[in-house]
Amino acid sequence: MASNNVAQFAAELKMPAGVLLEQLQAAGVQKASEDDALSETDKARLLDHLRKSHGATDGDKRKITLTRKHTSEIKQSDATGKARTIQVEVRKKRTFVKRDDVAEGADQGQAQVAEADDDAELKRREEEARREAELLEKQAQELRERQERLEREEAERRAREEAAEAERRRAEEEAATKRAAAEAAAAQQQAAAQQAAAEQEATPTQSAQDEARAAAERAAQREAAKKAEDAAREAADKARAEQEEISKRRAAAEAEARAIREMMNTPRKAVVKAVEPPKPVEPPKPAEAKGTLHKPAKPEGAQARPAVKKPAGAAAPATTQAPAGAGDRNKKPGAGKGGWQDDAAKRRGIKTRGDSSGGVDRGWRGGPKGRGRHQDSSTFQAPTEPIVREVHVPETVSVADLAHKMSIKASEVIKVMMKMGQMVTINQVLDQETAMIIVEELGHRAVAAKLDDPEALLVEGESGTDAEQLPRPPVVTVMGHVDHGKTSLLDHIRRAKVAAGEAGGITQHIGAYHVDTPRGVITFLDTPGHEAFTAMRARGAKATDIVVLVVAADDGVMPQTKEAIAHAKAGGVPIVVAINKIDKPEANPDRVKQELVAEGVVPEEYGGDSPFVPVSAKTGAGIDDLLENVLLQAEVLELKAPVEAPAKGIVIEAKLDKGKGPVATILVQSGTLNRGDIVLAGTAYGRVRAMLDENGKPTKEAGPSIPVEIQGLSEVPGAGEEVIVLPDERKAREIALFRQGKFRDVKLAKQQAAKLESMLEQMGEGEVQNLPLIIKADVQGSQEALVQSLLKLSTDEVRVQIVHSAVGGISENDVNLATASKAVIIGFNTRADAQARKLAEANGIDIRYYNIIYDAVDEVKAAMSGMLAPEKREVITGMVEVRQVFKVPKIGTVAGCMVTDGIVKRSSSVRVLRNNVVIFTGELESLKRFKDDVKEVKQGFECGMSVKNFNDVTEGDQFEVFEVTEVARTL
């Protein structure tokens, strides 16, 4: 289409509109914006301006440039003999200039300049190629000369060594000759001395002169021998020093030659730089040996095997071929003479053992997958030591993945684990510690991996929130021993009857309420006092600002009171003591104060920091003083939290409702929770579909320190989990799934590691009775408390085995699991549905319902007592004294006895005592009175008795009659 304005014309020319406006203004066409109209006249004026600015005088073309590209294929064999097809592309560029009579001189000058430029460029390239070839030839010549010089020096060294050896032999021969001459002279002197001794009397003066002359000759001979030995030693030292000097020079020359070969084999560019003389290459220093956590460092001698060196002369044939076509690689195909043929010739050069490319570097496209890139192919490098890898080990890893990280087969890992005494498969999950031991056993270095944890995003998000900190209500936890009146006290504050609604009159759930008082809002957490609810009390202390410790004035400090004090001190929370039940006649507040001082809680009147307030939950006395002290402590703490920010909190309690699904009671600690927010609590996530306050009324938002009940989570969260509001559901799902997988993998790895230990424990314990149980509770805290209480009942003979524990009603799956594991189902404040009851009756599964934790613990204890082996006890029923002994044929010995104490029964066992020492224990064979068999004989009567398998009865013996009874044991 026709371009009517500046913008369209610029789009047609494919150039920015701003640049076109500048060119139009330079041509004298005044256009202010891109939308201005553009006529054909304006375009013509712009074209004339551009032609003039680029040197054209008129519209005729003076010069034309032709570019021609030709592509062909050649077949070339590589180093392995395999034929390869290579694409060859030739590009040519020619410029034709149209000559005019008027401007012929100028055009001719321009053509000459262009030709001169082309010739200069061509000459420059040829000169560069020639210089590079000369440089490479010069380097090769220097290398050859250096090699020849080394050979000459080696020959000279050998000649010098031979001369030194000959000199040493000659010196040794001369020394031996001199020693022989000295020995002969000594023998002659000895003979002369003997002869002189005979003539001593005649010529004493002549004998002394001969002795002096002989001693001088011997000294001269010893001096000559010593000089000969010194000369031989000096010649040997000189030869050794010369040999060491030659070795050093040869090593330096070899290093220099190796450096030159490496430089010649690296890819060369067209631009030739000044070549510096190569420096001697120092041998690489061995890496510092480092030990690891599970495996110490190897000794110095075992770090590496010595490298196999190749003689320097072996690399010369391959190196001397390098200059032949070194410059052709960077030339254009048309510039050199047979560049491809020279390359092929180089590839067909002499090969070494470790070089498959013919001794020539192939450059960036030399081999498949970049093999041989920048490597020194002229020398063979044998592997010096095994490759040590740094293996990053995550928290859990399968055997196959671990083998892949070490680049070995999975069977090698399985072999190592079999040697360590563990049978595994390739899909088995290992924990981090075991995996690190295996990695170090295989000679690699193990590093604990830092996981790509999506939870790190939560920390980043927290650092970016800068909301205004505003005052918030205090969170007060009411703690104390069971039946000390915690809930009744809170009930009086709330003006509602909560304690009456709890089963058995004891609190079994953690309750959260906020109360509007004339002095401000206070949030109360009511915790159970029973010993089974330790975890609940710990959670209450964790989420609280102030602890109100309730102690009964008539009961004093009890075990759960001490535990509550420990929780408060561990959390660094201030304590306000409420001494309850002061309206009772037996109340003794002073005794309570003394007991609390012993536990480290000192009242303010004694110089401490804990207010003590006497109260009565029944009459309401002291309640106002208690609230006053609580709010005073809150003012001292200066409690603040951001309000206009995403909510954060803690799960106080959680349960599974049949109609509502997972329900969680949470305490908002900072920010504001709105209906519709995306929340993450542990492994559970979801959108807040409904939000209720503690009275069951719907609410749209909850600020800091306000407890609410939310619905819409994917599963029942764990009590005590942190609750966070996230911007989108995808992020919440990702973090929740990551936590689930991490928890599952860690649990599986720990179970696998503990299998062998548990097996050995069971083998050592022998016969242990197991009581399998399946526990279903209404809320998370009750289920947790019940499981802990029942597990504490386990003994060495009877063990409680929790097969499964969860929150919610009893379903068919629970009954099927109980059938398979032969377990008893315990429902705490839950019931079984119709299908589950029918299935339980059909399979004979025992389902027991409880709503008080005392009853559940007591009945399980009774069941465990019934599983204990009965205890056997002996009961002495009577004492018998032997008065006379009768020998009866075919029967044996019969004792005539008098029952002195108790009663004797025919079925009883008996001990025979002689002089108060037991000599036999057995059973009665017969019991007669006169000639009649009787069942029993009482005290004061006579009877005849015979003991089975015992006839050695004498007068005066005593029979102790006893019975063995079985007594049921209790825990």
From Swiss-Prot:
- From the UniProt entry, list the residue stretches annotated as the region G1: 480-487
Q: Where is the composition biased (Gly residues)?
A: 356-369
UniProt feature, compositional bias: Low complexity: 105-114, 182-203, 304-326
- KW Protein biosynthesis (keyword) present: yes
- Localization annotation: Cytoplasm
Keywords linked to the UniProt accession: Cytoplasm, GTP-binding, Initiation factor, Nucleotide-binding, Protein biosynthesis
Q: Where is the composition biased (Basic and acidic residues)?
A: 48-63, 121-181, 210-261
Residues that, per the record, bind GTP: 480-487, 526-530, 580-583
Superkingdom classification of source: Bacteria
- Single GO molecular-function term? translation initiation factor activity
What transmembrane ranges does the database entry give?
A: none
> Residues annotated as region G4?
580-583
Q: Which GO terms describe its cellular component?
A: cytosol
Where would I find the tr-type G domain in this sequence?
471-640
* G2: annotated segments: 505-509
Tell me, what's a Pfam family for it? IF-2
**For the region G5, what residue ranges are annotated?**
616-618
Return the annotated region ranges for G3.
Answer: 526-529
Region described as Disordered: spans on this chain: 48-86, 101-381
| Primary location recorded for the protein, binned into one broad class | cytoplasm
Q: PANTHER family from the entry? A: TR-TYPE G DOMAIN-CONTAINING PROTEIN (PTHR43381:SF5), TRANSLATION INITIATION FACTOR IF-2-RELATED (PTHR43381)
Tell me the NCBIfam families matching this sequence.
IF-2, small_GTP
* HAMAP family with a match to the protein in the record: IF_2_B (MF_00100_B)
What is this protein called in UniProt? Translation initiation factor IF-2
